[in-house]
């Protein structure tokens, strides 16, 4: 492509470079490809990556990459995704990730990933004994934790070993996922976490490490990725949430349920 012939460009990574590995990862559900394969599912999902001698050369090469998109049906809210006629966002079988702790994944026809319930105590008795019952619905938007230090990683892949220097809060989980992704024994993956700075959960689990490693593998030399703040905002966020909560209490302030 035109990007590959730009000054300073060492490698351009696209989906065709991932055909020899299983490119999906995810700490709970393996639903994130290293780069988009057949579909782009959200704003900010990587479709390609460029390694160059300088950041400005890499950015210039990225502008030369042409992508033809076919517009598909969109579910841009929880309500739209749960509708009977909603487009299926993730097809195929759900696969648990390295930190999956939700029990067995159910067969599903729609966009619901998992249903979970827990009961403790006598809820009906608590409601009958309560002097006040408050039943409300709450909406929480997606948030970005906004640490001053953005996401960054240096990756080296020589074919036999992966070496990472990454701002990650879960290095052992990242190591396990990287070993699976690139089909290496776990002892062949080494991760060093320098001074992390702020994280607040936003640097939890695997984020940029697969992309940097795949690019380093193709470039056959170490690769560094340092996000800008706006790039970090689409790298990781806490999901938005709709929540219904019913609280039961006595007139003396004792919480019953």
What are these regions (language model features)?
Residues 38, 152-157, 178, 242-251, ...:
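Short beta-strand elements
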Residues 1-108, 125, 133-136:
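Flexible, low-hydrophobicity surface segments
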Residues 11-16, 42, 134-138, 164-166, ...:
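General beta-strand structural signal in soluble alpha/beta enzymes
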Residues 22-23, 58-61, 142-144, 173-175, ...:
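Short helix/loop capping segments that flank catalytic or ligand/cofactor-binding pockets
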Residues 1-15, 49-69, 152-219:
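Alpha-helical support elements that line or immediately flank enzyme active sites
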Residues 28-58, 200-249:
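Glycine-rich and small/hydrophobic secondary-structure elements
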Residues 121-182, 241:
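Conserved beta-alpha junction segments in alpha/beta enzyme cores
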Residues 17-19, 47, 55-57, 94-95, ...:
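Short, glycine-/Ser/Thr-/acidic-enriched flexible segments
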